[in-house]
Design a protein with these regions (language model features):
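Intrinsically disordered, low-complexity regulatory segments
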Residues: 1-239
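Arg/Lys-rich, low-complexity, intrinsically disordered basic segments
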Residues: 210-304
Length: 304
């Protein structure tokens, strides 16, 4: 299988196939790293490596039957912005599927993480995030992020296409509070983006969802194995325009239109409106029709 794939919607099944193939190689690669370790307790290192390899195989099995998503660049930007104040996150109820492979058209800002260098020693690096994958195994969930390996300086040349960036392993049916002071910052950043993306995907007034069935070799292989080769494409609705007069009540004259930023809201629903669900109130353009739109420069950054 080629370890070089185009970065486009139709290539998503191939990208997933590449990741699954690389996960299948984890046992041998993990053992090589264990053998090169300078840790004096070689037996413990090898036992840990074997356990990791077995877990990776179970993740690959579930990921292979999961849903595939392509998130457009504008939707990535909105989700990253919305992640800054997204409320708590329950993977069991908020994620669109139990297992998923999400490819981002535009990468997320770099996370401070580490890789093994050419001497098989850990080295701190900053890696962008191109892919997020999640797998539910029993009562637990594994959320992983990956960078295209071509962006990793001085990494081990193992022929892999993807480089792991960061991951989280925890309970699938539980509320994750992002404002918890004990939470790991990298985990908060990764999961808050995924939470925002998942909640926005479920908001029909915000996101457009279309289904593409790529006619590619990888998609045909998925079909032969009984897997769905369809890719859900998530893109952003154009913001609505809320017209106003040319002046406000005080007599101030408007010379431009402007963007009003979206925000999260707990909306009541259900019997006697006793239940609450998190909804994104989308951004909209306000001001007199026909006036120029005042553009503001935005810098996408991780939640702090």
């Amino acid at each position: 299988m080629s370890r070089f794939a185009d970065w486009r919607v139709s290539a998503v099944p191939e990208l997933r196939a590449i990741l699954l193939a690389e996960k299948a190689e984890v046992p041998a690669r993990t053992m090589r790293i264990a053998d090169m370790s300078t840790n004096p307790d070689k037996q413990a290192v090898r036992a840990e490596a074997l356990a990791k390899a077995a877990y990776e195989r179970s993740l690959a099995t579930t990921l292979g039957v999961g849903e595939m998503y392509w998130v457009s660049a504008d939707m990535v930007g909105l989700a990253l912005d919305a992640a800054g104040d997204v409320p708590g996150f329950n993977p069991a109820t908020d994620l669109p599927a139990s297992h998923g492979f999400m490819v981002l058209e535009q990468p997320l800002p770099a996370l401070r993480t580490w890789v093994f260098d050419t001497d098989y020693q850990k080295r701190d690096v900053e890696l962008e995030v191109d892919v997020i994958a999640w797998s539910t195994v029993g009562t637990g969930i594994r959320i992983e992020s990956f960078c295209r390996n071509g962006r990793v300086p001085n990494a081990i040349d193992n022929g892999s296409f993807f480089e792991p960036v960061w991951y989280h392993t925890g309970v699938v049916d539980g509320l994750y509070e992002f404002d918890d002071e004990a939470a790991v910052e990298l985990t908060v950043q990764l999961m808050s983006f995924l939470a925002a993306a998942a909640l926005l995907m479920a908001s029909p007034g915000v996101a457009d969802r279309t289904t593409l069935a790529p006619k590619t070799k990888a998609a045909r292989k998925d079909a032969k194995r009984g897997r769905s080769g369809n890719v859900t494409v998530i893109s952003l609705h154009a913001p609505k325009h809320v017209p106003t007069g040319d002046a406000d009540e005080s007599g101030r004259v408007y010379t431009h239109r402007w963007m009003v930023r979206g925000h999260w809201r707990n909306q009541p629903h259900g019997p006697n409106r006793s239940q609450r669900s998190v909804r994104w109130i989308p951004s909209y353009i306000k001001g007199p029709a026909g006036k120029p739109l005042r553009e503001t420069e935005r810098v996408w950054a991780w939640r702090r």
